[in-house]
Amino acid sequence: MNLNLIFKEQTLKFNKEEQETYLFLQQHNSDWANIFKEMILQGRDKVTQRLVTSMHRENLVKARTQSKKILSRDLIMLDISTTHILEIQFPQAKQTLYAPITGEHAFDRIDVEGPFYIKDDITNTITRVHHPNEILECILIEAPDLKNAASDQFQQDLINSATNMTFAISYQALSMQHDSAPLFNIIENSEDSYLRSEQAVIEGHPLHPGAKLRKGLNALQTFLYSSEFNQPIKLKIVLIHSKLSRTMSLSKDYDTTVHQLFPDLIKQLENEFTPKFNFNDYHIMIVHPWQLDDVLHSDYQAEVDKELIIEAKHTLDYYAGLSFRTLVPKYPAMSPHIKLSTNVHITGEIRTLSEQTTHNGPLMTRILNDILEKDVIFKSYASTIIDEVAGIHFYNEQDEADYQTERSEQLGTLFRKNIYQMIPQEVTPLIPSSLVATYPFNNESPIVTLIKRYQSAASLSDFESSAKSWVETYSKALLGLVIPLVTKYGIALEAHLQNAIATFRKDGLLDTMYIRDFEGLRIDKAQLNEMVYSTSHFHEKSRILTDSKTSVFNKAFYSTVQNHLGELILTISKASNDSNLERHMWYIVRDVLDNIFDQLVLSTHKSNQVNENRINEIKDTMFAPFIDYKCVTTMRLEDEAHHYTYIKVNNPLYRENN
């Protein structure tokens, strides 16, 4: 192959966002600034990797049908260490992309890694891809109808995400340079293992090109408020007049609940505001400091001037979780986890807090707890939910409709039970997203460490058999909660890696699975009503209620099977030389699912027995040869954040002669 290689490393330039971050780091820490500069291409490549993987699987601009695998020896002049390369044709752009393949996995996923190369098909020259936007340019030439406001925004998103990816991985390289132990050991030995696990997920979503999106924040704010930088955050407390708010709580009224959650704080606030105000006329709301500085004093100044919203001088010391807007105290503090509104663009959406979230959270908790208590099928599984105990949002009935919704969503608080109130001392809690994480000085992910521990504790002969037993225990707990809920009650929990907390025993096995965050779940309204649970008291703007059985199924399957179990199984398989291990682990998941469905059929509780036809319909869809896959990149380019786009992919749960 006669190619004239052109390498551009010598002319690598910062874009504006990278330059601003670099200047911030030069002022903050010159060593960090140097590492940031050295890792620019690595950070960009991690976002390019997500873009290429998703466009191929989604067949965006025929990236899958116009691709093929080639041997790396066919391009011996390139710096590629893998055996195979993914070649993707862009015929309209007259360019060809080369992406080194690191693995092929379930649901038609091909994993790639940088460096990536683009060949100009006219001049026959190859250049190294320096930024994911070079790939986006090819996409838009292939599909000019996608060149619009959404793609313009996506272009800026990729710049922001790549900058923050480098920001994050360079901090990890700096802060952990003296560490060498497996990441799980570091998490386990931390004062607060759960919080440390949230902070360990440096790269964000494993598949989303906007994994590190933080639009709306400058470098200093990103450093202060993002989980990976481990900074304490002083949450602001405001009093909001009862006539300008709506509240909901799980058992006792909102004020009583908050008083029980923060007894010392209430005394401090009473001393601060009495006798200036009638404390009983106000509700307590927690506000993110960025939201207070950026939004409160601009959009709510009239209410502040009238003392209908009052800022307290007291603050709460919290830390950001992986999701940015969910914050937690550091152990041994037992105050609640708090989900807040933030007008920051993260992973494709502005993360305000909808009215339905603060209203429906406690209501959903009440329904789920009632189901879990009364339906014996759940007694067999080591899984439960984390209560959302109270919520509040701003509400001015005098505001016009759209303006009213906007202002309500910008000022809201949801309180969630602290995980340490739910678990025994001898287990280690962590967010499952961290199970697949690594760091530069030890590439053993926590899930591999846990399996090795189990192998040793159980005196098993090899890693592969240990992995199969580990996956069986884990998937039984996860699916034993999700599948009966969606099948019997039409409730599809969004149980992806980020929406769970898992606790592990000393022998490495899962102890209990806890599912949290009910904002993104979906409910088959008719099915839940048929099971004698009313939805009439849900928020009038509820997006979680639907008549679409497909929407409900896809929500449960994508989050739980494709994302949650899919990432874990993929990571385990990469740690083994057995090319059949991934397939065999999916067989185990299929067996676990078969057993759960059998238990559903055998249920003797006539009062809440599900129709067997419904069970068979769900089984037929779940075990079909092809299954829907959510197209995250296509949705961003089509500006369809709330209307999901799917493509059919091969289903690893399918067996001939089902």
From Swiss-Prot:
GO terms for biological process: siderophore biosynthetic process. Transmembrane segments: none annotated. GO terms for molecular function: acid-amino acid ligase activity; ATP binding. Belongs to the IucA/IucC family. Pathway: Siderophore biosynthesis. Its EC number is 6.3.2.58. It catalyses: D-ornithine + citrate + ATP = N(5)-[(S)-citryl]-D-ornithine + AMP + diphosphate + H(+). This is D-ornithine--citrate ligase. The gene is sfnaD. Pfam families: FhuF, IucA_IucC. Coiled coil: none annotated. The keyword Ligase applies. Keywords: ATP-binding, Ligase, Nucleotide-binding. Involved in the biosynthesis of the siderophore staphyloferrin A. Catalyzes the ATP-dependent condensation of D-ornithine and citrate to form a citryl-D-ornithine intermediate.
